[in-house]
Each structure stands twice: as structure tokens, then as C-alpha cells.
Amino acid sequence: MNRERIKKFVGGQAVIEGVMMRGPGVTATAVREPAGTIVVQKEATKSIVDTYPILKKPFLRGCVALYESLVIGMKALSFSAKAAGDEEEEMSNSEIAITMVISTIFAIAVFLALPTFIVKFIPGVQDNHIVLNLIEGVIRLVLFLLYIWGIGLTKDIQRVFQYHGAEHKTIHTYELDLPLTVENVRQQSRLHARCGTNFLLIVMVVSIFVFAFLGWPNLLERIVSRVLLMPVVAGIAYEVIRLAGRSEHSFVKAIIKPGLVLQYMTTREPEDDQIEVAIRALEEVRPPESDAYEEE
């Protein structure tokens, strides 16, 4: 039975004045220094799923991928801040861990605790658990959109959003088997189905349905139950994103369409010098042509 050969995934992340790209077994962060030169940090990356193959199973792999992406992303941000001149030295592993803990606490407080706290003040729906969870999900989504809109008002984040667009355009060029030139990259869409923006939006939607089965206990129990179920929600969202990256089915396209629209907020059209940085990062991680494909 013939199996379809597909191009191996390359993912990425916009950082301060640069782009991080992650390919099979390697990660590279390219940053434009104040002097104008491009500096690159490249390192081999081994996933925990290589040691424990059971973690490659659907839904489990999503939790692993999310954790590893956060760790690698924080390291890339630390390097980019130093290279771009915003910081004198990179963060240590302990500083990265502390930053991740603080960021997690902030996310739990704003996107989990606050919405479920606000809902209790809405009259007329307190006896309908389904409606309560639906309203909570809508509030969570509104807070998320306000957060994205708010940070997008700052000049520094606007430049990050431009690099985000450059990252997507460059990955599109790679996936289309086109030469990685500024001209080719510039012509591609700045939206991408496997973007983290899509992932976060799908998390918001999936959480509404998952949390609906929890009933409506007291505030503390609601917060704890939602935190404990986030790996489940993330695992489901990851599988949806993974499917979206490989399927042309109209139903799948419909699911990810809202996330693509949302990317108009989280990406900007990049300048040519920003595209050059994204190209440099991808060139460092792209697998050789002999190993660029895998069987579906």
C-alpha cells in the first residue's frame, strides 16, 4: 500500500529582532544585531519522546510538545534579548524556570481564575451550568483578544509581529519547495495553519466543552479543576493543529479559519531585512533533501 510522502515539519517563533526555527533535532535562533549583522545560535535538541516513545501517542505528545516549546522559546527569547542589546547577558536555566513559573501564574490568574470569578456576578444564569461555562469561555476569549490587542499597540511588539509574519512566510516557502530567497518569501502568506495563535484559540474553544462536564463547584475547585485539565485541553488542541497542517479537508479548514483571521492581529507584513533573518534561521535547521520527507 502506497503511503503519501510529506515534508517534515519545521516550526518557529518570533523573538526580539529575530526568529527561532526548530527542525528535526536542531534549533536555531537568528537575530539582527544593532550593528546590522545577523548572529545565530544553533543547538541540537533531543525530545523526551525519543527516550520515552509512549509519549508519541496522540494527546500525550501535545503536552510534551507544549512544554518543550515553552522551554526552547524562553531560551531563544533570552538569546535574542542579549543579541539585540536589550540585556547584558542571557538568562540562566534557573532564571528561565522562574520566568516560566511567573508566566504560568499570570496566565492562570488572568485566563482561568478571572473569567470563572466574573461569571458568578452575572444574574439569571447561576442554575444553568452549561450556560455558565459558555459565558466563562466567552469572557476568557475576550480577555485573550484584549491582551493581544493591548500588547500590539507597543512598537517593540509590533516589530515582533513583523518577524512573526516573516517566520510564517519563510516556512511557507520551504513547504512549497521554493528557493529561500527574499523575493519568494515576500510573496507568501503571513498566515499559517500551525501557528501558535491557532493553537491558543483552539485551546479556548476546546476548554469550553471540556469544562462543561465539570459542573459548577465552588471557586477554588473550579480553578483547580481547570488547571488540572489544561493538559487534556492542550493535547486535544495539538491534535487539531497537527491535522490542520496536513489536511486540505474543507471541515478542517473551517475549524482553523478563525485562528487564521486572528493572525491578522499577531502578524505584520515584514520588511526585507526581517525576511533575511527568518531565512537564515530556517537554513540552519532545514533537513537535507535526502531526509526532508517522511511517510504519512
Roles of regions detected by a PLM:
Residues 58-81, 246-265:
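A transmembrane-helix-recognition feature enriched in membrane-embedded lipid enzymes
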Residues 95-111, 192-203:
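Select subsegments of transmembrane alpha-helices in polytopic membrane proteins
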